[in-house]
Curated annotation (Swiss-Prot):
Pathway: Phospholipid metabolism; phosphatidylethanolamine biosynthesis; phosphatidylethanolamine from CDP-diacylglycerol: step 2/2
Superkingdom field: Bacteria
Membrane topology term: Peripheral membrane protein
Enzyme class, UniProt record, top EC level: lyase
Active-site residues (renumbered): 88, 145, 249
Gene Ontology molecular functions: phosphatidylserine decarboxylase activity
Record-given protein name: Phosphatidylserine decarboxylase proenzyme
GO biological process: phosphatidylethanolamine biosynthetic process
EC number(s) stated in the UniProt entry for this protein: 4.1.1.65
Keywords attached to this entry: Cell membrane, Decarboxylase, Lipid biosynthesis, Lipid metabolism, Lyase, Membrane, Phospholipid biosynthesis, Phospholipid metabolism, Pyruvate, Zymogen
InterPro entries: PS_Dcarbxylase (IPR003817), PSD-B (IPR033177), PSD_type1_pro (IPR033178)
Chief place where the protein resides: membrane
HAMAP family xrefs: PS_decarb_PSD_B_type1 (MF_00662)
Length: 280
C-alpha cells in the first residue's frame, strides 16, 4: 500500500472500534492461543526477548503482560546526563519550539496550546523552549521512564482521535499529536523548572497507564479531565518508570526556554534507547 493510500485509510477506518477490539483481545487469557500469538508477534517484529526479564512467551498470560514486559536489570543503564531518553524507540523530531509552534514533519506543525488541551498559560511557559518527539514501534520496550528527577504537578486526560502514529501519518495527518487521544503529565525538576511528558495514543493502543494513577484509559471519557497532585508530593527519580503503553505510540517532551543541547547523534529517525543521554 502506498503511503498516500495508507494515510487516506486512516480517515476511513473505524479506529475506535478496532482499538476496543484489540484491547479486549490483549486482556484475554487465551492459554496456548495467546502464547502462539505472542510467538508470531515476536517473529513478525523481530522482538529481542533476550533483554526481557522473562524470555519465555508462555510466561505471559495475556498480550498486555507481554507488551509491558520488564527488562533484565542493567540492560538499560541510565547515563550521567542532564536529560536521558525516557523510552526505546526512534526520534520523530526534536529541536526548538518556535513561538509556541512544534515541528511535526515537513510542511506541518502544531501549537503547544493545542497539544496541552487548550491550556494557554501552561503552553506559554514553553513558547520558545525545546521539544523532542519519540516514536515507539510495536517491537520496542513499552515502559516509559523519567528523563530527569521530577515532582508531579498535574495530569490531564485529553480525548481525541486514534490515528496510527508512525512516520507516514506524521507526514500526512495535520496536527497528528495534538488531535489524538493523549495524557499530559506536568512535572517540575529539581531546579523547580517545569517540563511536560505527553503520552499520545493511537489506533490499537488499548490503554495508557501511569505509576501513580494506574490505567488512565479505558474508559474513554467524552471531555478533558484533570488531576492535581501538588499536595501529594509524588517524586520520581531519573530513569524511574512513570508509565506504560499497551502496544506502542509516541511520547512528546517539552522543556522551557534556556540552555539545552540535544545529543548530536539524535536526528530524525535515529534509533534510541531508554537511559541514553538525550540532552545536556
Amino acid at each position: 500500500m502506498s503511503e498516500r493510500l495508507f494515510v487516506l485509510s486512516q480517515h476511513i477506518l473505524p479506529k475506535l472500534a478496532l482499538t476496543r477490539l484489540a484491547g479486549r483481545f490483549a486482556d484475554w487469557k487465551g492459554g496456548g492461543i495467546t502464547t502462539a500469538a505472542i510467538r508470531r508477534f515476536i517473529a513478525r517484529y523481530n522482538v529481542d526477548m533476550g533483554e526481557a526479564a522473562d524470555s519465555d512467551p508462555a510466561a505471559y498470560a495475556t498480550f498486555n503482560d507481554f507488551f509491558t514486559r520488564a527488562l533484565k536489570p542493567g540492560v538499560r543503564p541510565v547515563a550521567d546526563a542532564r536529560l536521558v531518553c525516557p523510552v526505546d524507540g526512534a526520534v520523530s523530531q526534536l529541536g526548538a519550539i518556535d513561538s509556541g509552534r512544534i515541528f511535526q514533519a515537513k510542511g506541518r506543525d502544531y501549537s503547544a496550546t493545542a497539544l496541552l488541551a487548550g491550556d494557554a498559560d501552561l503552553a506559554a511557559r514553553f513558547a520558545d523552549g525545546h521539544f523532542a518527539t519519540i516514536y515507539l514501534s510495536p517491537r520496542d520496550y513499552h515502559r516509559i521512564h523519567m528523563p530527569c528527577a521530577g515532582r508531579l504537578l498535574e495530569m490531564t486526560y485529553v480525548p481525541g482521535d486514534l490515528y496510527s502514529v508512525n512516520p507516514a501519518t506524521a507526514r500526512g495527518v495535520d496536527r497528528l499529536f495534538a488531535r489524538n487521544e493523549r495524557v499530559v503529565c506536568v512535572f517540575e525538576d529539581e531546579q523547580s523548572q517545569p517540563f511536560v511528558m505527553v503520552l499520545v495514543g493511537a489506533t490499537i493502543v488499548g490503554s495508557m497507564a501511569t505509576v501513580w494513577h494506574g490505567v488512565v484509559n479505558p474508559p474513554r471519557r467524552p471531555a478533558v479531565e484533570k488531576w492535581d497532585y501538588r499536595g501529594q508530593d509524588i517524586r520520581l527519580a531519573k530513569g524511574e518508570e512513570m508509565g506504560r503503553f499497551l502496544l506502542g505510540s509516541t511520547v512528546v517532551l517539552l522543556y522551557p526556554a534556556g540552555p539545552l543541547k540535544f545529543n548530536p547523534q539524535w536526528q530524525a529517525a535515529s534509533p534510541v534507547r531508554m537511559g541514553e543521554a538525550m540532552a545536556s
